[in-house]
From Swiss-Prot:
Belongs to the radical SAM superfamily. Lipoyl synthase family. Residues 30-50 are annotated as: Disordered. It is found in: Mitochondrion. The lineage of its organism: Eukaryota, Fungi, Dikarya, Ascomycota, Pezizomycotina. It is an enzyme of class 2 (transferase). Pathway: Protein modification; protein lipoylation via endogenous pathway; protein N(6)-(lipoyl)lysine from octanoyl-[acyl-carrier-protein]: step 2/2. One of its GO terms (molecular function) is lipoate synthase activity. This is Lipoyl synthase, mitochondrial. GO terms for cellular component: mitochondrion. PANTHER family: LIPOYL SYNTHASE, LIPOYL SYNTHASE, MITOCHONDRIAL.
Length: 415
């Protein structure tokens, strides 16, 4: 064995001698019966190459030290400095583009809780869709992820996941010929909601201009199924405009729901640039007015996005028109561009300004206003307040049924 080991080492001697001259990189050779040579046993010299400097390392070395950071006695940033948007170069080398970073107040955690997974599994099992997923809502981790399931909120999207309209702010799929309605959807929706044990639920839908009634009867049937299975659940319906057919609006308003919501989305002047050409601000105002007239005890609700280029005067005008038709609740949220194919963000509105408009809305007489960068029309904080108001009304009337609402048959002709 010793002879074979010495013979093998002699074969590697030439390689080691060449490595000393720097011609060939050193090669470590071991026989099957040899042990790892110790550092002192080898005379090979290793050549180390200097690591390439990077832009990040240069910036890090040039920046403040930890001692500087801890001992900094500079005054706090004022609001304008704290809210200043930062930019970054994004893209491959040689083709980088300057992009505005998302403000810190718009960043949310990635959803991955047990409650989130449970809700998602139930929805998939019953072939149901939610606007939370389809519209890429930033609040999904908050609304679905709470440990208290009674506080969880999932906005069910009826009549499929494909819309017949193409609003320039919305990421929901569009088609002129979406799939037919699922006749089992009202029953499946009611079953899922009763299974979750929620106290408040939001129903919405895609626009279905391909249907004669715009899907109003399907919507109303779903509400009635829910009330049959769980009369105590409070139901909010966020509907479309049914192409201006106010009889269909009245049908849904009288189906037994508690809150009728329809979004004007933006101020009147920007509506043609923001919404589909088949929608308009005055038509939305008429929808909200018809719902309130059909069932005066209903809470009516709408929502506006900020950051689209609206002016203060345009916002004042929108709020005045909403109060004229007795809209009870309004919400303000930041428009966030879903993809590069959609409208660009004109402005990231600061939290302070959202608070200013919340106070202005309350001063104008709105029952409630949820206003903030991440607030959406079905934001659960607003629902908690509305739920409390409705429960107080029920307690005052001594009933567990929807106060002042008489559910009508789906095929009943409204007058």
């Amino acid at each position: 064995m010793a002879v074979s080991t010495s013979h093998f080492r002699s074969l590697c001697a030439s390689s080691r001698s060449l490595s000393r001259t720097g011609i060939v990189a050193p090669i470590s050779c071991r026989g099957y019966a040899t042990t790892e040579p110790s550092p002192s046993a080898t005379s090979t010299t290793t050549t180390t190459t200097a690591r390439r400097r990077t832009t990040f390392k240069d910036k890090l070395n040039a920046g403040p030290s930890f001692a500087d950071f801890v001992g900094n006695d500079n005054a706090p940033l004022d609001p304008s400095e704290a809210y200043a948007l930062k930019t970054a170069l994004v893209g491959p080398a040689g083709r980088k583009k300057e992009m505005t970073r998302l403000p810190s107040w718009l960043k949310t955690p990635i959803p991955d809780s047990k409650n989130y997974q449970r809700l998602k599994k139930d929805l998939r099992g019953l072939n149901l869709h939610t606007v939370c997923e389809e519209a890429r809502c930033p609040n999904i981790s908050d609304c679905w992820g709470g440990s208290d399931k009674s506080a969880a909120t999932a906005t069910i999207m009826l009549m499929g996941d494909t819309c017949t309209r193409g609003c320039r702010f919305c990421s929901v799929k569009t088609s002129r010929t979406p799939s037919p309605l699922d006749p089992h959807e009202p029953e499946n929706t009611a079953e899922a909601i009763s299974r979750w044990g929620l106290g408040y639920v939001v129903l919405t839908s895609v626009d279905r201009d391909d249907l004669a009634d715009g899907g109003a009867r399907h919507f109303a049937e779903t509400v009635m199924k829910i009330k049959q299975k769980a009369p105590s659940i409070l139901v909010e319906c966020l509907t479309g405009d049914y192409a201006g057919d106010l009889e269909m609006v009245k049908l849904v308003a009288r189906s037994g729901l508690d809150v009728y919501a329809h979004n004007v989305e933006t101020v009147e002047a920007l509506t043609p640039q923001v919404r589909d050409r088949r929608a308009n601000f005055q038509q939305s105002i008429r929808v909200l007015e018809a719902a309130k007239n059909a069932q005066p005890s209903l809470i009516t609700k709408t929502s506006l996005m900020l950051g689209l280029g609206e002016t203060d005067e345009q916002l004042w005008d929108a709020l005045r028109q909403l109060r004229v038709v007795n809209v009870d609740v309004v919400t303000f949220g930041q428009y966030m561009r879903p993809t590069k194919r959609h409208m660009a963000v004109h402005e990231y509105v600061t939290p302070d300004r959202f608070e200013l408009w919340r106070q202005r809305a309350l001063d104008m007489g709105f029952l409630y206003c949820a206003s903030g960068p991440l607030v959406r029309s079905s934001y659960k904080a607003g629902e908690a307040f509305i739920e409390n108001v409705l429960k107080k009304r029920r307690a005052a009337s001594g009933s567990t049924e929807t106060v002042g609402v008489r559910p009508v048959a789906v095929d009943e002709v409204t007058r």
